[in-house]
């Protein structure tokens, strides 16, 4: 996070307006502008662990990571700068949370790319902080309003639920495949062998559906789940609990917080970070897997068929197999061998 996003570049056109403000930055924080903008004081709240990692190095305790912001997170702020995400329910969760904490009279700025649907901020906040568009550049919109009424916020009302083959999946806004099991995960699940044993790590666990489906027909596996997303971590914990399955779940930027080695690592890795296309997480997953697999252990991932993962798998493990595929997706398998250890 060094170069500024288009949304941040639009904000910088108004940097003089923020010099005397005590600002809370929140939403889809894709760069480190919150740490670099000249203000009277700056705080940041994010639901994304990898964004918090970057910001906390520069902002210390003034950068916070959690599912739900608290009064302490917004203390003494008189301005909110909210970066609109690509997911409207996620924006509603975060904005209703934040506006329920900020005092009436707080200046509200909402910025985002037009393709993300930032225009819908006007309707969403009409009853609380009526917005006007104050700038348009870099295919982004910047909106301004003032908080007139605090909304009521109840995080419990944002939970969703669906069933997959008799399993209960708990979800929250911003979690991948919130409305049902995606095709890629279905393909990966079809390759998992019943009665598997050992330690299994689910990286980028989302709502936890891969892990609970695996554990149902392989009850002796020991599960560890991680994700960069606070909503995903909480959703996975709830999904495990709803199905009576035990497992450790925590926030991690791929392997950043993972300790130890595993017999299998499974993943449906993301290739979008907000509105941006990024292969970094998946490549970090593949290259880092050799440090977290036991000898003979395997990495098994599903990905869009067009993504360039075979070369990275071969560079890291020495070989790979495609064990299932459709027109759109492939399931890759790589085994931890002595050859892989040299990589």
From Swiss-Prot:
Record carries keyword S-adenosyl-L-methionine: yes
Catalysis performed (reactions): guanosine(1207) in 16S rRNA + S-adenosyl-L-methionine = N(2)-methylguanosine(1207) in 16S rRNA + S-adenosyl-L-homocysteine + H(+)
Membrane-traversing stretches: none
Signal peptide: none
Subcellular location as annotated: Cytoplasm
One cellular component term from this protein's GO annotations in UniProt: cytoplasm
One Pfam family per UniProt: MTS
EC number: 2.1.1.172
InterPro entries according to UniProt: DNA_methylase_N6_adenine_CS, Mtase_sm_N, rRNA_ssu_MeTfrase_C, RsmC/RlmG, SAM-dependent_MTases_sf, Small_mtfrase_dom
Keyword Membrane: no
UniProt entry keywords in alphabetical sequence: Cytoplasm, Methyltransferase, rRNA processing, S-adenosyl-L-methionine, Transferase
GO MF annotation, one: 16S rRNA (guanine(1207)-N(2))-methyltransferase activity
Organism superkingdom: Bacteria
SUPFAM superfamilies (alphabetical): S-adenosyl-L-methionine-dependent methyltransferases
Assembly description: Monomer.
Family in the record: Belongs to the methyltransferase superfamily. RsmC family.
General function of this protein: Specifically methylates the guanine in position 1207 of 16S rRNA in the 30S particle.
Name the UniProt record assigns to this protein: Ribosomal RNA small subunit methyltransferase C
């Amino acid at each position: 996070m060094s170069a500024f996003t288009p949304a941040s570049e639009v904000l910088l056109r108004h940097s003089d307006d923020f010099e005397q403000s005590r600002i809370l930055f929140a939403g889809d924080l894709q760069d480190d502008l919150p740490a670099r903008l000249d203000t009277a004081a700056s705080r940041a709240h994010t639901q994304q662990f990898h964004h918090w990692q970057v910001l906390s190095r520069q902002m210390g305790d003034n950068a916070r990571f959690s599912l739900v912001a608290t009064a302490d997170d917004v203390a003494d702020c008189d301005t909110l700068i909210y970066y609109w995400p690509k997911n409207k329910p996620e924006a509603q969760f975060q904005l209703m949370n934040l506006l329920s904490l900020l005092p009436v009279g707080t200046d509200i700025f909402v910025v985002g790319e037009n393709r993300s649907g930032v225009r819908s901020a006007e309707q969403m906040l009409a009853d609380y902080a009526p917005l006007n568009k104050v700038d348009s550049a870099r295919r982004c919109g910047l909106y301004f309003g003032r908080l007139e009424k605090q909304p009521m916020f109840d995080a419990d009302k944002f939970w969703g639920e669906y069933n997959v083959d008799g399993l209960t999946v708990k979800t929250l806004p911003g979690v991948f495949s919130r409305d049902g099991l995606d095709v890629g995960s279905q393909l990966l699940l079809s390759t998992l062998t019943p009665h598997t044993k050992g330690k299994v790590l689910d990286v980028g666990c989302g709502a936890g559906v891969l892990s609970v489906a695996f554990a149902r027909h392989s009850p002796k596996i020991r599960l560890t789940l991680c994700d960069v997303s606070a909503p995903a971590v909480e959703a996975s914990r709830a999904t495990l609990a709803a199905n009576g399955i035990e497992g450790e779940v925590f926030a991690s930027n791929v392997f950043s917080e993972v300790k130890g080695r595993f017999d299998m690592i499974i993943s449906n890795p993301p290739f979008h970070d907000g509105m941006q296309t990024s292969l970094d997480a998946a490549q970090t997953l593949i290259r880092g897997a050799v440090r977290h697999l036991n000898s003979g252990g395997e990495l098994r991932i599903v990905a869009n068929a067009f993504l360039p993962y075979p070369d990275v798998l071969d560079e890291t493990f020495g070989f790979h197999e495609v064990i299932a595929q459709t027109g759109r997706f492939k399931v890759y398998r790589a085994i931890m061998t002595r050859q892989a250890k040299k990589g």
